[in-house]
């Protein structure tokens, strides 16, 4: 059997990043030959965490839409389309080189471009979404119709996601469940 190649995309915050890492850990523990490539944002928490975790990753120059009318927010929103275009080109190169069998999106602005590239007419790569919140975020809502399955943390009824939901709970990294109480207090 060929090696399974999976892209796990998500980040911006720990709520999207750490479930992505937990999913990757679990997949590798079940099939060590699987190749996983993480995709996140240069501006998210993953920019610090991925190098520490020593995982194969790419950071996109993407940033989320800024709400509010502050000057800095308006400048960032003006630049956003250019960041999206750069992220699309970078992401296409990753897909052409890596040729993933599946893409898992854990939400947040960092997963939108990788999911968009996966689901375009040329690629048609199957996607799975993982939603940690009781109400789906924007990225989950945008890609729900194209997803093969949507793994949810909470067993809530949601009209947008009917028929595709698998109640999995929140993915938790092994270091969290197998931690030592003493070192937890220390850190």
Regions found by a protein language model. Give the residues of each.
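Glycine-rich, highly charged phosphate/nucleotide-binding loops
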Residues: 77-93, 184-185
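Active-site-proximal region of nucleotide-activated glycan assembly enzymes
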Residues: 2, 37, 56, 119-186
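Conserved nucleotide-sugar phosphate-binding/catalytic loop shared by glycosyltransferases and other
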Residues: 3-13, 33-84, 168
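Residue-level signature of catalytic and energy-coupling elements of molecular machines
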Residues: 15, 50, 107, 150
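An aromatic- and histidine-rich active-site surface loop
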Residues: 43-47, 100-121
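Short amphipathic alpha-helix
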Residues: 16-27
